[in-house]
Amino acid sequence: MWSFARYTQKFCLRNLQLKNFSNKVKVSSLLFCSPNVRNISNWQCKRFTQSDAKDLASGVPSVKSDADQLQPKPTYNVSFTCTVCNTRSNHNFSKQAYHNGTVLVQCPKCKNRHLMADHLKIFSEERVTIEDILAKKGETFKKGYGQVINGNVVEFKPPQFKIRPAKSSSSNSSK
């Protein structure tokens, strides 16, 4: 019986098969396709580099050091009260999205969406953040550094009291 999923899988495999993974073959990138568990007709693809192709040819799995692993991306946490239903909630979003993209957060109770930042100019003619919006309304916006545990802010420090990491003793001894 013919199925779209099997045809796509065979098509992906045929396109990915290389006769020789030697140095003569310049493999800039490959796509590895695997079916999505939820829906067999959707395919997820992962890009492989030339070094991955060499590892596949030699049969040795590549082990990356801790330095090569991805570092956690900086995130922001905002706690706000929905103006529609007066529900207080916490939301996380990336620092990159807040400073370069458009961020909307959804109230968990009334499902209303609130604009936090719009640097892509989707909702207005100028780039705005929640700080600008609240300043125009005359409301306050508190910034700081802290810890959020189980949805509650445990420790909050204003920006001028940012805790800096202690200098290591090896850098002090080299002076």
Curated annotation (Swiss-Prot):
UniProt record, GO biological process: protein folding; protein import into mitochondrial matrix; protein stabilization
UniProt signal peptide: none
Molecular function terms from GO: protein-folding chaperone binding; zinc ion binding
Pfam families membership: zf-DNL
InterPro entries: Mt_import_TIM15, Znf_DNL-typ
DNL-type zinc finger locations on the chain: 71-166
Annotated binding of Zn(2+), by residue: C82, C85, C107, C110
Domain of life, per lineage: Eukaryota
GO cellular component, one term: mitochondrial matrix
Keywords, ordered alphabetically: Metal-binding, Zinc, Zinc-finger
Protein name per UniProt: Uncharacterized protein C24H6.02c
Organism field: Schizosaccharomyces pombe (strain 972 / ATCC 24843) (Fission yeast)
